[in-house]
């Protein structure tokens, strides 16, 4: 989704309406039509509808239906029980999987992440009302057209991230949704609606209920978006205050502007953007933060080396740079150059390192 902003520009030259037509892939149409021929409803739903409306090719297609899982399985030759206890069956067509999920009403979220039970429903509206954001609560089929009960089209037109229903309820159900709001904001270049933002601030401590592995996934998606500087929202909402204090400081303290600009000016490589976010501490502190975040070992090692050999930690003389190149190797040194160039651009400094061409002959 990193190129959404550029891909959606032509689509949104004029405001979208509920009459919007979606050209469903052949396999998706086949699944929906097959379920309908057996007397049930079926719709494409969620992110695939959102992305298509915005002119972006979806990574996958999800389908929602009032057919029960066992009924769905009986209609297709090859299926996989991927989450049948929650109503999800994966239909395999032409080596591609399509998740088909029965309309459901979620029970209580006792752990702040997952429903303790689900109840299957016969009404599409029951399924849409449990979803996180309005832009993800739209459904579509060729017979009915677009179903948009919560103003998803309006929020796409106005570039707004807004919860379905009461934000506090949505975030109490699943605390990860607070990070997802910020991640979608960064990926789409959208603003978080006031009540949704205030609910994140109020419930920020609940993020401790989310595993660090899931936190890591959302942070990486935010950093690899076209707006990595939106990471400041992880600080201003206090989401990272208790779970990732170094990153919280990076996004809120006096040096946050330089850090976020460095992140923005860095090329779209995860180690570079992580280095920018962790440049307010030592390489050892960065390593501790990344291990707590459950980052992979290769990325941790790369970030630590970039910080160790960056312009802040080595003399900007040719002998010192040659020595650094020898110690860290060509691949890491090229990342050091890229990081330092972004750092200088962010700091509006003119230094030796600000002109990589001056020492490209050393690499």
Segments predicted by a language model, with ranges:
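Catalytic cores of the polymerase beta-like nucleotidyltransferase superfamily
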Residues: 1-363
